[in-house]
């Protein structure tokens, strides 16, 4: 089995490691019959009559990707979508491949860093400036220490008053949300309900968190029937 890997300097594994494992490094995939990726492929880059494996984001009928689905059909591409790989091979069964806890970890770390830079741009010094971006940390444990340090600064000196009460809202309780909540929990915080949001007191020494579920964002046209996501 010949394996071709496209060169990239953004992966956790170096190109040389793939070569040492027996892979061939090349940007040319025309000799490959099966092509694996993660995110959706640009339409112009799809090679005809191949099998592609990636997250296409079309299974729910996402309108922004219907053009991609049309191109897949026109180019006679066999699409294997990670999202459709389930425990028993049936739609609705538990998925076997999905973005996980680490995606939420990395995203929350980057959000804190971005929040710090935004506050600074508005003229406010703040504890989040001491949280480097995810890629700058040598390990997840190192990132946790950075977030804890920022949390200690919040406990002692608080966040800028103009941003209080600072609230982080998590949509849903999937893997990514749980990963984000995991990092958030390292800060001095209080979890509140959706009903509490309009009445939160100003408190500079902690951050509020709220998990928002589908029933908090949607309502049935017929209010006499109980809410259901199905």
What are these regions (language model features)?
Residues 15, 34-37, 90-93, 218-222:
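Short, solvent-exposed polar/charged micro-motifs at secondary-structure junctions
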Residues 25, 52, 79-81, 206-211:
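Conserved beta-strand scaffold positions in the cores of enzyme catalytic domains, especially
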Residues 1-8, 123-230:
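Glycine-rich phosphate/diphosphate-binding loop of Rossmann-like nucleotide-binding domains
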Residues 1-71:
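An N-terminal-biased, well-structured beta-alpha scaffold segment characteristic
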Residues 13, 30, 63, 67, ...:
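Conserved active-site and cofactor/substrate-binding residues in soluble primary-metabolism enzymes
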Residues 18-23, 75-77, 203-207:
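A short helix-to-beta-strand connector/capping loop
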Residues 23, 34, 74-78, 112-121, ...:
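Generic secondary-structure signature for well-ordered alpha-helical cores
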Residues 43, 47-166:
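Glycine/serine-rich phosphate-binding loop and adjoining beta1-alpha1 elements at the start
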């Amino acid at each position: 089995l010949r394996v071709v890997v496209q060169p990239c300097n953004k992966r956790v594994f170096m190109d040389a490691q793939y070569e040492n494992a027996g892979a061939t490094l090349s940007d040319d995939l025309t000799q490959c019959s099966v092509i694996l990726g993660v995110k959706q492929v640009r339409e112009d880059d799809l090679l005809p009559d191949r099998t592609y494996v990636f997250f296409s984001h079309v299974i729910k009928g996402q309108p922004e990707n219907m053009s991609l689905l049309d191109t897949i059909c026109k180019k006679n591409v066999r699409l294997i979508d990670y999202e459709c790989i389930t425990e028993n091979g049936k739609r609705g069964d538990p998925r076997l491949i999905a973005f996980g806890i680490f995606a939420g970890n990395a995203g929350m770390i980057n959000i804190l860093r971005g929040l710090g830079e935004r506050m600074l741009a508005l003229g406010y010094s703040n504890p989040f400036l001491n949280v480097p971006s995810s890629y700058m940390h040598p390990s997840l444990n190192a990132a946790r220490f950075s977030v804890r340090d920022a949390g200690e600064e919040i406990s002692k000196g608080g966040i800028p008053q103009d941003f209080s009460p600072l609230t982080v809202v998590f949509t849903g309780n999937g893997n990514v949300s749980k990963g984000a909540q995991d990092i958030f929990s390292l800060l001095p915080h209080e979890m509140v309900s959706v009903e509490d949001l309009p009445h939160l007191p100003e408190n500079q020494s902690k951050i509020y968190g709220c998990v928002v579920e589908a029933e908090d964002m949607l309502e049935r046209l017929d209010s006499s029937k109980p809410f259901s996501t199905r």
